């Protein structure tokens, strides 16, 4: 995965040893991803002299980072960009009946101990799931717009306690970042729910949560984005998301601020 490898390069420049997950061949979906892989990665890093263990992710892997950190106490730094605060239904990507993505019945984003974690099901089934995303993307002028999918699904199925991520179990430091104008899901609402949950429950982690008015789904550190796209990174974001086209300066300012904040968190 090119974006993941680029993120690794950015982290390596900060002097951090990095392992990264890899998508399956011809399967870029997320469904019943075994958290044992994270568990084994932690053990491998420990056995090779790494005293501090952190996890970072963006988008669906931002949710993965939160979920893993809530289960594995060896993780002492968690960075989640545009996460959700709950686990949702697993999905596949590819080509099926003219659709590029579809939900998988009975499967969660993640599994542990051979069992899918409890998840919020999508209210749209195949092929309506992708048709709705495609229609919303065209209507809003975004590369992809699935926010309505998540809003409608939560309206139909109130998220249960088991489906929410137990963020109060996260150890060490927790850094959350998102933007109000995220076109994929309402990460700003989810981040604020995490803050409320932590305010209501005993926890040991030190949390820093930042939500920008403008930043799109690509709330990457500016240096990381430029590593991914050395030429034309800002143009790519503007082409991908209508909010970046309307507010390019604000989005870039957010990425620069994220770069500073995240670098400080990692190097502390």
Language-model segments: which ranges?
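Short beta-strand immediately N-terminal to the catalytic nucleophile in serine-hydrolase-like folds
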Residues: 55-58, 81, 177
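Accessory cap/linker subdomain of secreted extracellular hydrolases
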Residues: 79-167
């Amino acid at each position: 995965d090119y974006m993941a490898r680029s993120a690794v390069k950015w982290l390596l420049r900060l002097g951090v040893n990095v392992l990264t997950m890899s998508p399956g061949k011809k399967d870029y979906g997320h469904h019943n991803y075994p958290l044992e892989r994270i568990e084994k990665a932690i053990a491998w890093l420990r056995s090779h002299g790494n005293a501090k263990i952190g996890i970072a992710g963006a988008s669906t892997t931002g949710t993965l980072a939160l979920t893993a950190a809530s289960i594995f106490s060896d993780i002492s730094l968690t960075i989640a960009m545009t996460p959700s605060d709950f686990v949702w239904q697993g999905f596949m990507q590819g080509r099926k009946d003219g659709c590029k993505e579809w939900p998988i019945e009975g499967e969660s984003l993640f599994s542990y101990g051979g069992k899918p974690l409890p998840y919020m099901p999508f209210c749209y089934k195949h092929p309506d799931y992708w048709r709705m995303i495609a229609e919303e993307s065209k209507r809003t002028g975004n590369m992809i717009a699935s926010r309505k999918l998540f809003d409608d699904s939560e309206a139909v199925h109130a998220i249960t306690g088991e489906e929410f991520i137990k963020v109060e179990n996260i150890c060490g430091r927790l850094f959350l970042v998102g933007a109000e104008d995220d076109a994929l899901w309402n990460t700003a609402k989810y981040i604020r729910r995490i803050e409320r949950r932590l305010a209501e429950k005993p926890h040991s982690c030190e949390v820093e949560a930042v939500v920008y008015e403008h930043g799109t789904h690509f709330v990457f550190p500016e240096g990381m984005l430029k590593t991914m796209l050395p030429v034309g990174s800002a143009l790519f974001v503007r082409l991908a998301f209508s909010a970046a086209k309307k507010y390019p300066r604000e989005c870039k300012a957010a990425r620069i601020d994220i770069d500073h904040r995240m670098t400080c968190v990692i190097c502390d």
